[in-house]
Amino acid sequence: MAFPLQKTFLCSNGQSFPCSNGRSTSTLLASDLKFQRLNKPFILRVGSMQIRNSPKEHPRVSSAAVLPPVPRSIHDIPNGDHILGFGANLAEDHPGYHDEEYKRRRSCIADLAKKHKIGEPIPEINYTTEEAHVWAEVLTKLSELYPSHACKEYLESFPLFNFSPNKIPQLEELSQILQHYTGWKIRPVAGLLHPRQFLNGLAFKTFHSTQYIRHTSNPMYTPEPDICHEILGHMPMLVHPEFADLAQVIGLASLGASDKEIWHLTKLYWYTVEFGTIEENKEVKAFGAGILSSFGELQHMKSSKPTFQKLDPFAQLPKMSYKDGFQNMYFLCQSFSDTTEKLRSYARTIHSGN
């Protein structure tokens, strides 16, 4: 994942059953959202409105300006020009803030991501023994909860990766697995991308992923996405065709969206891909990466403390919270196909101008 903060059964021969609408995720086209505007380059202006950053929970609207050009391919999306935080520059409350060696390590890994060119193999990271121990502890602890807490699609996909506590997977290997099943690719990133760039990447079936790992002082906690979150939270779900469609629909909706719409789409991503839950046989199971990559969040989700609501993409969504402890509320999906259709309906209002 690259900004703040989450089947059909996969056959043994490497093929996947089609989505419920009869199409594999590779045939999900931009035309589904009426993207005639993608046929030629252009710059969008939304009336005379501009959205400007604000310290408040949502952006502030002010007078005329031009939105960024709409990317026509993943090549048009910068990789690292707008890193919002973390990366090698850590906040004072970060576990690794006072560890100069850790910060230098993060900086080196971030530099590799910044230099990466699309089409080239993702740089391999030679993880240290300490980093490998962190990965092993996280994988071992989370694997204890997955059978009872994770959705069935996650459990079906998980074995495809052959995760081992003895080795941190490399992004290039994982990217090849995603390509094989759903046509998605991974692109390394130095830290938290601007939401517009991150969401735009999803439209082109590209997932921006960090490569650094959380600080060794607290293996079960990270204030930002790291390689453990990316691998254990996101990768198993992205080989599931219907979930991959869901993520891509959010990305397609972001192409040419105003800053205000980007903010709403960011929340939709947050409450589905990051912290989404789904009902299975009258039980709540996790499919969001922010839950699946957190031992404490998984336990909290199954406790009596949080509340659950149905997702309405058109409604005003609660403030995103990732530093105030666990989520107080989760959105509960009935199915991935149903949620995707709801998101697609919302996306049509963005691109029809309504």
Swiss-Prot record:
Record keywords: Allosteric enzyme, Chloroplast, Iron, Metal-binding, Monooxygenase, Oxidoreductase, Phenylalanine catabolism, Plastid, Transit peptide
Broad enzyme group: oxidoreductase
Organism listed in the record: Pinus taeda (Loblolly pine)
Residues binding Fe cation, per UniProt: 229, 234, 274
Catalytic activity field: (6R)-L-erythro-5,6,7,8-tetrahydrobiopterin + L-phenylalanine + O2 = (4aS,6R)-4a-hydroxy-L-erythro-5,6,7,8-tetrahydrobiopterin + L-tyrosine
Protein role: Catalyzes the hydroxylation of L-phenylalanine to L-tyrosine. Does not seem to be tetrahydropterin-dependent and shows preference for 10-formyltetrahydrofolate as cosubstrate and electron donor.
Main location as per UniProt: plastid
EC number: 1.14.16.1
Protein name (database record): Phenylalanine 4-monooxygenase, chloroplastic
Family: Belongs to the biopterin-dependent aromatic amino acid hydroxylase family.
The keyword Iron belongs to this UniProt entry's keyword annotation: yes
Subunit structure: Forms monomers.
Transit peptide stretch: 1-60
